[in-house]
Structures are given as C-alpha cells and as structure tokens.
C-alpha cells in the first residue's frame, strides 16, 4: 500500500478521494492507497475505535460464560493507572460473583455465599473511577449511591431502598436484570458511628444507615416505589430480591492510618523504652496492614463489616503515577484538552517538566488525581479564552514556567499568518 500526503495545491483532475468518507487528499493528513480504493487517516482512526469497542464488549469468556479475571484487569489497565492489587482483587471478586450466579442457576446442594467488596484508600486514588470503569466493561446494570445522602426510613433524606430504585432505573425497570447488577456506595466512611457509646442519641445518618444497609447487602426482597420518593399506602411496589446484587463500598477513611499505626505500636515507658521516630510511611503503605478491627474502631459496626468480606486497599498516588494519569490512559486529561484544542485546529503540547510540576501541585493540595483537572483548567483558562479570536495559531506549548505562573504559553503561528502579518506591515 502507498501513502499519499495531503497538500494545499494540485490539479483537481488528479485529486484523489477517500472511498469511505469522500474527503479529498487536500482535506486530510494522509490518504492510503489500495489496489482500487483509498482510505484516509481519519477513517482508519474511526475504524480502530469501532474495533476497540467491539473487543471490549466481546471479552474472552470462561467456561461459565463469565469474563475472565485476566480479561477484566486488561481493560481496567487501559483506563486506571497503578493500583494493581486492588484491580486484581476487584477482577477476581466480580468474576467469582457471576460464576456464583451461573452456579446458582444449576441445581446443587452447595450454596455459594456472596462476597461484597470494601475499597479503602486516600482521596483521589481511583476508588470511584475503578467502579465506574467496571460498569463500562461488564454488561450488567450499575448504579452509584452517595452514603452521605442516606438516612434511616422515616427521616428526611433518601431511604436505602432508593439505591435499589436507581439500579432498577439503570436496568430499564427489568427486575430480572436489576437482580444481577452492581451497586457502588461511595463515601461509606461518612456513615461511621458518631460516638463509641451506641446509646448516646439516635444516629439516623450514621449507625442507623449502617443498620438499614445490612439487610439489602446480605439479601432481602426490597419493596421499591416505581416512581421513587417516599412510600405511600396506595402505591404498588416492585419486589426486588437483592441476594444476587454485588455491593461495592468505598471511602477515604481519613485518620484510619493512625488507628492502624497505633495498633502496631507496643508502647512502653521508662528509661528502657524504645524511642520511635514519627510515622514517615505513606498512607497507602499503612493501609496495607488494615484489619477489620481497625474499621470497627473507626466507627463501622461489626455486622456491617461482616457483610463486606473482601477488603481492598488502594495506594496514594506518587508523582510518577500522577504524570502517567495525565498522559497515558485512553481518556487522559492531556488527551482530552488536546482534543478540545483540535476543534480549534490547534495542536496542544506539554513539556515533560510541565506535567511534573502539575503532579507536584496536586500532591501539595492532597487531592490526588481528582485535583489534576482544576490545575489544568487554571493553566489553560486564558489560552482557551483567547484562542477562538486569534488567527493563524498552529500550536500552543505549555512549559513548567507556565504552570508556575512565571510565563505565558508559547503560541506558534502558521507560515501563512506570518506572511499576512508581514504584508500588512
């Protein structure tokens, strides 16, 4: 196959066109010639996107027709940087969950219990994003709930049954599909018990919510009002069995590392006591030693922890990981902004030092990967404001000085606009 480069000149009689989209060689970067047809670089890219999507949906299945853990983790790797242990735990847990459902469909005297998952990690390390990515690659209904909005039944706020309603809506009110879905409950650390004394006052948004979640996580038939909201006696309810719904809970658990560290220290007093240096390990390293008893001390009730037998801890992201997150995944932030600039026919490029400075600033803010977008927005705000009204800008280059605020982005103009400027001068 031969390549034909796009150019601005040329005889119209000899102009070649893409056989798929009909664009001429002057409208595209490359035109690839076959024996009797031509295809442009844009159509090649579109075809590759279609193939990638099909590969994602037609994952390799195990004997039970369930996606294999290797296949699940392979797709997770395309979107989520690092967190290999957490990805491994998640992929095995999801694989086993759907194997269990396939097993339950057959008559057997051995009943396989459900293994719900708890994700623990610092803010911005990828807990929510892992769950969202899982939802995209597994063909089951999925919903996310915020634990901070939940209250006990009868109080102002959302009932726990509303979570099942959201799952039912995600399944287009197909009860059978909803009963095989996945529910992710975020910010679960915010419903920890407010006091070590369980009888102090009624804790309707803390321990009360944990108690309310117990039955739906273990398995019960929930009565769900089809149009949402509070229940009315005249309403007809949909009955949803939650036995086969996989629950994943996630939270940052700020301060949990101190509880774990305190458990590991055997303090002594007197002249023979060992003088310990202050804890200099990263939060993610400390969380690896997490035990269920630490979560009880944090404020979760033992019954709630017992419904979440699979514990996965996530690492806090270092500078190198944040740089990878900025540039490597399929929907990396740099790629997103480059696509935005492409819509203005402008190429956006970042120096390696600029990405490193952005990562450093995110670490200082202690917001993890979540803080990267706000830093990028601040850096590119003036450029995005000016660009639509500027003529002839071909490329914008961001250096570390731009990130630090000591310089402006470098604008590179096309030769044509420079010629026009010289003529007008």
Curated annotation (Swiss-Prot):
PROSITE patterns: CLPX_ZB. InterPro entries: AAA+_ATPase, ATP-dep_Clp_protease_ClpX, ATPase_AAA_core, Clp_ATPase_C, Clp_protease_ATP-bd_su_ClpX, ClpX_bact, P-loop_NTPase, Znf_CppX_C4. Zn(2+) binds at residues 18, 21, 40, 43. Transmembrane segments: none annotated. One of its GO terms (biological process) is cell division. CDD domains: RecA-like_ClpX. The keyword Chaperone applies. GO terms for molecular function: ATP binding; ATP hydrolysis activity; ATP-dependent protein folding chaperone; protein dimerization activity; unfolded protein binding; zinc ion binding. ATP binds at residues 122-129. Keywords: ATP-binding, Chaperone, Metal-binding, Nucleotide-binding, Zinc. Signal peptide: none annotated. Residues 6-59 form the ClpX-type ZB domain. GO terms for cellular component: HslUV protease complex. Belongs to the ClpX chaperone family. Component of the ClpX-ClpP complex. Forms a hexameric ring that, in the presence of ATP, binds to fourteen ClpP subunits assembled into a disk-like structure with a central cavity, resembling the structure of eukaryotic proteasomes. ATP-dependent specificity component of the Clp protease. It directs the protease to specific substrates. Can perform chaperone functions in the absence of ClpP. NCBIfam families: clpX, PRK05342.1. This is ATP-dependent Clp protease ATP-binding subunit ClpX. It comes from Rhizobium meliloti (strain 1021) (Ensifer meliloti).
